[in-house]
Amino acid sequence: QYSESQESGHNRNAPDKELTTEEFQLIFHQSQTVDIEYDFINITTEMIETERKVSFTIDGKEYHLSLTPAASQSVLPYGTKIKSAIWWTDNDTHIHEEDYSDERWDSRAIYENLEIMATILVRTENGTSYYDGVFGEGIAMKVVRSLPGRLMNIYGANYHFVYDSNGSVYDVVLNGQDEPAVPADMAVNNFYPKLLVLVDYSLFKIFNENFEETVKYLTIFWNAVNLRFRPVQHPKVNIIITGIVIAKNEAAFQHVYRARYSKNSKLVHTGRVIDNGRYFFGTNFDPYYDNYDASFTMASMDDPTGKGGATVIGGICSSSNNIAYIRDVGSYSGVKVATHELGHLLNGQHDSDTTCSEKINDNIYTIMAKQGSTKASKFVWSSCTLTAFANFSKTTSAACLKDTYRK
């Protein structure tokens, strides 16, 4: 075993003021004109075989996290297809192969802790570890970011920024047409939701239009969603990202562009994204992608009604209902909503529509609560949702989930 710790004599009163505009954007995913509340922490690491014992202090409170390698394969396997989309002068969306994949994002780099919902991408160089990821839930959810190389030389490589995620807790599902459940010959014991992830230009801009930063973020984001499904045992759920498409201009994703309330508007009608998507995906993506069970479009635009996401209950294997939309602002704010929407696709209903309560106590709410609490610090699966997943696994509507590759 070994320990890592490093001190620096540099003034740490306002390290954010030493960031360039680009560095500030890449760390906080916001403009430098925004006043950010953050903590500047020194992380020490003790290695015991494959376990990382990480310690740091925030506002006098000591944190001791035990991080272990991801229990399942990373949601973003090496070699995942990554493409870009651009709206061209011929009034059409063009898809381009980016040929961008990196083994740094595979399962060997992801560490986790189920108890505190920590998902951390670890990079080790010259005996020093750098941590990027998220831990905690709800009001207690925090983002940890390593320093850019220039600041490591000033403060020391073990220093990191930590700030609140401000995760979204509100959701309204868009219900589709109910289809009769047809019993399957055999239940599916393991769900492998194969997802096509689309990053709208509104979100890509938050990452400084940087492909590496975007892919890194998506890796952490969807591994965090996957971790929230870990308590589900019947069937077990393991997400696989089979493709990523990143919009390089505003009109590239027409299902989002045409769902805005007005031209040049930063407001979007969540329900229209789903309605528009039924045509958009059939036209644009069938020739490029066939190995996905559902698409998730991620954008940073607001819905004036407060909706954070939308999809169709039980629609994951349906060619017309396997579309989901989530709002995310680059601070993992959409992790809970993405978990919720995938829960809907796997046939979970709002707990308020079942016999289960949405609220365990003031601090704990269910993941499938229609409107969670802004004060909740933990989310759990209700018995009603777990039963819905199990029942879904026994129908032909879940058949596409049994394989890691869609046939």
Swiss-Prot record:
Activity regulation summary: The gelatinase activity is inhibited by EDTA.
Signal peptide (residue range): none
Cofactor (UniProt): Zn(2+)
Tissue: Expressed by the venom gland.
Chief location of this protein within or outside the cell: secreted
Gene Ontology MF term list: metal ion binding; metalloendopeptidase activity; toxin activity
Active-site feature positions: E341
GO BP, sorted A to Z: membrane protein ectodomain proteolysis
UniProt GO cellular component terms: extracellular region
Pfam families (UniProt xref): Reprolysin_5
Cofactor binding summary note: Binds 1 zinc ion per subunit.
Disulfide bonds: C317-C400, C356-C384
Main function: The recombinant protein has gelatinase activity. In vivo, injection of this recombinant into fifth instar L.oleracea (host) larvae results in partial insect mortality associated with the molt to sixth instar, with surviving insects showing retarded development and growth.
Record text about domains: The N-terminal section (alone) shows no toxic effect when injected into the host. This section may function in stabilizing the catalytic part of the protein, or in directing it to specific target sites of action.
Self-association and partners: Monomer.
Protein name (Swiss-Prot/TrEMBL): Venom metalloproteinase 3
Classification lineage: Eukaryota, Metazoa, Ecdysozoa, Arthropoda, Hexapoda
